A protein has these predicted regions:
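Substrate-binding/catalytic subdomain of NAD(P)-dependent oxidoreductase enzymes
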Residues: 175-273, 278-280
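Catalytic, metal-anchored helix/loop core of enzyme active sites in primary metabolism
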Residues: 146-150, 158-161, 165, 183-190, ...
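N-terminal glycine-/serine-/threonine-rich beta1-alpha1-beta2 phosphate-ribose binding loop
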Residues: 1-91
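Rossmann-fold NAD(P)-binding glycine/threonine-rich loop
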Residues: 81-87, 91, 100-138
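A short hydrophobic/small-residue beta-strand
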Residues: 94-96
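Rossmann-like NAD(P)H-binding beta-loop-alpha module
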Residues: 68, 115-197, 204
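Flexible, glycine/charged-enriched surface loops at secondary-structure junctions
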Residues: 34, 188, 192, 213-221, ...
Length: 411
């Protein structure tokens, strides 16, 4: 019998326990032996839980029990999760996690520890929730050089933007609905709406693609707080919708660029039709071309099912599972991983007349004049040109309120 421990009994942790209980026979068949939860570590009081005898508060109980083969980490964050996971791997126990912050920050180190101590560190649920993407990318696409990853990886902001488009809601109203439905945190939704969640996910995928650690702090990140109903309407005039896009590109010289930003997505682009809490990630390989991974990116049971699938793999294959899943440690780079390539942009400028905006930004057209300024579509510019234009706007008493890159019509 394989005995496991669960660290954290919040949304995902309780989901993992539920999946293991409801589908016990199926999980055991796939693992090749019965699977049993022996401990659940959580500081809260679960004395009224039907399985209260499983709950413990001392991590050392798990570490000192030789029967524990696999540890599931669903605490989140890094303060407790990182030292606990590190200790488990150093003791030769495999770890399965959904913790994107920990993987994005310490992935290379933890993968190295797993390899050193003959166990596995698995994190399928950290990027796509219940939608598989880590395993397909490093196994099914192993014959490809991946040059680009681009997609919608945060279900909360995608739900909010869908509401803003379909129901003409403002940011605050869309956020309130997302919170009422449990898609956004009630106390502090900033990880989602400010893009940090998406940033961690694209950092993980970038590390996987590039073979060395790419850190979230080096990825330019903007969220959706600045998006207004007027921007949504202007996007419609341009034949686009607004989506929060996470992306990375790898040049032929090995250079890496990455970012998280709200973008104009033309309706002909397949990402434009990805709505509500669904995610979609487009991966470009040199041999296969484009592959899209699509599904619900979050949710208790979808995410838990991905974690349990990792548990099965760890039990069945041990240190051999996904042994090619590895990237090298690296120091954070100086500066940001920006993309120098030119693109079309939507800019919203306040405080100066449309004619002045047109004179500053050059070739393009006014989209909306309802502001004390205007919304302007720039046909072609790079980040350096946009920064120079912003300085000129400020020099004449204006301010740039929003900049949105337009994606190509076809991926």
């Amino acid at each position: 019998m394989a005995k496991i421990a669960i660290l954290g009994f919040g949304t995902v942790g309780s989901g993992v326990y539920e999946v293991l209980c409801r589908n016990a026979a199926r999980v055991s068949r796939r693992a090749g032996e019965p699977v049993e939860v022996k401990y659940i570590l959580d500081p809260k009081d679960f004395s009224n839980h039907p399985d209260a005898h499983l709950f413990i508060k001392n991590f050392d109980t798990i570490l000192e029990d030789p029967e524990i083969k696999v540890v599931v980490e669903t605490i989140g964050g890094t303060r407790f999760a990182y030292p606990y996971v590190k200790a488990c791997l150093e003791s030769g126990r495999s770890v399965c996690t959904s913790n994107k912050e920990m993987v994005a920050t310490y992935g290379a180190e933890l993968l190295g520890l797993a390899k050193e101590h003959g166990c596995a560190f698995l994190f399928e649920a950290s990027v796509g929730g219940g939608t598989p993407i880590i395993t397909p990318m490093h196994q099914c696409l192993a014959a490809n050089v991946i040059t680009e990853v681009e997609g919608i990886v945060n279900g909360t902001t995608n739900f909010m933007l869908t509401k803003m488009v379909r129901e003409n809601l403002g940011f605050d109203d869309a956020l309130k609905i997302a919170q009422e439905l449990g898609y956004a945190e009630t106390k502090d939704p900033s990880d989602d709406v400010d893009g940090r969640d998406a940033c961690r996910k694209i950092a993980i995928l970038s590390s996987l693609v590039c073979g060395h650690q790419i850190y979230p702090q080096n990825i330019p990140t903007r969220g959706i707080r600045a998006i207004t109903t007027a921007d949504v309407e202007a996007a419609e005039k341009l034949g686009c919708v607004i989506k929060l896009i996470a992306w990375m590109k790898r040049g032929k010289d090995g250079s890496v660029a990455a970012g998280v930003e709200p973008c104009l997505v033309p309706k002909a682009n397949q990402l434009a039709s990805v709505d509500d809490v669904f995610n979609a990630v487009l991966v470009k390989g040199d041999m296969l071309g484009d592959v899209v991974f699509y599904g619900k990116g979050a949710g208790k049971l979808p995410t838990a099912s991905a974690v349990v699938a990792d548990v099965v793999d760890a039990l069945k294959h041990g240190s051999k599972v996904h042994d090619s899943l590895f990237w090298q440690p690296a120091e954070p780079v100086e500066g940001m991983l920006t993309d120098p390539a030119p693109a079309a942009y939507y800019v919203r400028v306040a405080g100066i007349a449309p004619a002045v905006v047109e004179a500053i930004y050059g070739y393009g057209r006014v989209v909306d004049e309802r502001y004390e300024g205007c919304a302007y579509f720039v046909e072609r510019a790079d980040e350096k040109a946009l920064a120079e234009a912003a300085r000129k706007v400020e020099a004449v008493g204006g301010s740039v309120k929003l900049v949105l890159k337009r994606l190509p019509e076809e991926n």
